[in-house]
């Protein structure tokens, strides 16, 4: 099941969700929690679910673009430049991928920031023009909160794609790697 806007909005659980999950569990139906969230680690998402649902949640049942990055990209890189939250950077550091300055990185990963930085985006465009590999965690233009829709990291991705006439590979639900993760791991 999806999370943002389906199970909760911001820090508010949607009515009936806990009861539905309990019923599914009573009927031995395996539940995977899928999200395009690009600013929180899987453990942070697990903590949020446990807090909101007051239920135990298996972290291995949480699938995010960061899980796809860990599984399919991280072992191929020595270093990366992160455009995203501090939480995102902390998680990437746990994967033994060195976070470095943009100019010396092997690749760029676009996540979500609370406040976008135009100069940083222009520098990223310049590096990609010069051949730097780039990935994004998702292409969501917005994400739901209890205060309404907020700009997502897809807005930054779109700026880069439009400027360079390229298609940035997404590790999120709209990309090819997300569904292939489910196939590879026999998740149905």
Q: What are these model-predicted stretches?
A:
Residues 1-16, 20, 33-34:
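Asp-based phosphoryl-transfer active-site loop
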Residues 17, 21-48, 62, 79-84, ...:
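Substrate-recognition element of Asp-dependent hydrolases with the DxDx(T/V) motif
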Residues 42-61, 130, 146-161:
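Substrate-recognition/cap helix-loop segment adjacent to the acidic, metal-dependent catalytic center
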Residues 58-68, 103-105, 139:
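A short, structured active-site edge motif that brings together acidic residues
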Residues 71, 75-96:
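Short, charged N-terminal beta->alpha structural module
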Residues 76, 169-188:
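Conserved Lys-Pro-Asp/Glu-containing loop-to-beta segment of HAD-superfamily phosphomonoesterases
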Residues 96-106:
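Short acidic low-complexity segments
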Residues 137-174:
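Glycine/Thr-rich beta-alpha phosphate-binding loop at enzyme active sites
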């Amino acid at each position: 099941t999806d999370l943002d806007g389906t199970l909760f909005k911001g820090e508010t659980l949607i009515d009936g969700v806990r009861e539905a999950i309990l019923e599914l569990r009573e009927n031995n139906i395996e539940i995977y929690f899928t999200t395009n969230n690009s600013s929180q680690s899987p453990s942070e998402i697990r903590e949020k679910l446990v807090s909101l649902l007051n239920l135990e949640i298996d972290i291995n049942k949480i699938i995010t673009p960061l899980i796809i990055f860990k599984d399919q990209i991280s072992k191929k890189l020595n270093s990366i430049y992160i455009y995203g939250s501090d939480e995102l950077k902390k998680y990437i550091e746990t994967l033994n991928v060195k976070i470095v300055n943009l100019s010396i990185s092997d690749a760029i990963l676009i996540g979500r920031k609370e406040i976008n930085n135009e100069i940083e985006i222009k520098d990223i465009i310049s590096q990609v023009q010069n051949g730097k590999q780039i990935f994004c965690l998702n292409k969501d233009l917005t994400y739901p909160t209890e205060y309404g829709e907020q700009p997502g990291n897809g807005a930054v991705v779109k700026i880069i794609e439009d400027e360079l006439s390229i298609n940035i590979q997404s590790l999120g639900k709209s990309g090819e790697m997300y569904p292939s993760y489910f196939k590879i791991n026999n998740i149905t």
